[in-house]
Amino acid sequence: MKNMFKSLFSVLFLSGALFAQSEAYNALKVLEPLIGEWMSKHKSLGVFEGEPDNQAIVSSYSFEWVTDKTAILETWRSSTEKDSKRIHTGSILYTLDPSSNTIKTKHYGYDGKVYWTGKGWVELQDSTIYTHVEELTINGTKTNYTNVKTLVNELSFNNQYTNFIQNGKSIKDQPVQKMRRVDIAPKKD
């Protein structure tokens, strides 16, 4: 009887631990369609401190699960199309915040030679992901904006920066960047 009780307790304990480990995954799985490699060719916006204006760039993005699917790491690098000079590089860590049961973000990187960090939170509506961001550069520039990612299909999403407030001044919404998946072989007819 004692051994049966220990076995039952062990099964219940392990089941509870596995359930607890799935909470973060269950919250973050709405971002799972983004897992993979993406790219876009577009013009630099010139909005972020250190970023050139209206220059042809190539942006590469990667989304991956980390730490046993308890977080998602987004990394990117943008460089000039002509000579591959770095324009942006950065990362965002998406995690489940247990106190609010919402997805929170931590950001860091460079725009040109200007270092910045930030934080944010995620809201979802249909196939659109809204990341509300607050950033601060090493030089003291404060920028708030919303990054809007709209899933078009499994091979593409639209990426846009909206609702800009930089040092208290409104800035117009930026053009949509068309992102395409580059880690899946094209389907053959």
Region roles according to the model:
Residues 1-5, 189:
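Short, Lys/Arg-enriched, disordered terminal segments
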Residues 4-16:
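Sec-dependent N-terminal signal peptides
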Residues 21-189:
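Hydrophobic small-molecule pocket/channel-lining residues, especially in calycin-type beta-barrels
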